[in-house]
């Protein structure tokens, strides 16, 4: 015959399992969003487009190191309610030396609908690119490395960041953590070949 404590444990196990599951589900619901869960939000109305290249198409040479090396014109639309500022990161994951950051910009005013070529909206702060300089650095892949993808990531944030212009991408991403309302990605291509 089994002891009373054995039956108490056997009967109590399902109750403990239900309680643990409930606690885990509540913790997951209340946990702050991570960059991964936030940046997968392409279903919002936020959009980033350019008049000079379509998503997945070639970036004109004038916006690269083989041209004027100025940022391409961009249009922003569908900024979600609650947005306090926008941020932009442009990088090349195909770079020979690893992911190369071409441009970071933040505290872009939410009323911004256009980022004109070779300019940024008033109040916008530009950070350090992978060349160690603040501002835009156009695509410049070495010959023989094929077509590179230039990822333009636009973020809608629930706060202004107030970071200094010596901030790099990693510091920018850390500051955005938990404050991303929506994201949209525009991809441009460029090849030296």
Language-model features, listed with the residues they occupy:
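N-terminus-centered regions that define maturation/targeting leaders and the start
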Residues: 4-193
């Amino acid at each position: 015959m089994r002891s009373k404590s054995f039956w108490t444990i056997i009967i109590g196990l399902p109750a403990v399992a239900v309680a643990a599951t409930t606690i885990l589900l509540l913790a997951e619901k209340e946990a702050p969003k991570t960059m991964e869960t936030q940046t997968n939000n392409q279903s919002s109305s936020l959009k980033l487009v350019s008049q000079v290249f379509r998503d997945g198409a070639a970036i004109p040479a004038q916006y690269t190191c083989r041209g004027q090396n100025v940022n391409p014109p961009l249009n922003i639309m569908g900024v979600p309610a609650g947005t306090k500022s926008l941020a932009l990161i442009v990088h090349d994951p195909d770079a020979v030396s690893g992911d190369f950051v071409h441009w970071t910009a933040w505290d872009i005013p939410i009323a911004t609908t256009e980022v004109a070529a070779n300019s940024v909206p008033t109040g916008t702060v530009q950070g350090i690119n992978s060349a160690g300089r603040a501002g835009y650095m156009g695509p410049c892949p070495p010959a023989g490395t094929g077509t590179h993808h230039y990822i333009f990531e636009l973020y809608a944030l629930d706060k202004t960041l107030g970071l200094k212009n010596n901030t790099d991408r990693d510091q920018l991403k850390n500051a955005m953590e938990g404050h991303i309302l929506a994201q949209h990605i525009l991809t441009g291509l460029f090849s030296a070949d």
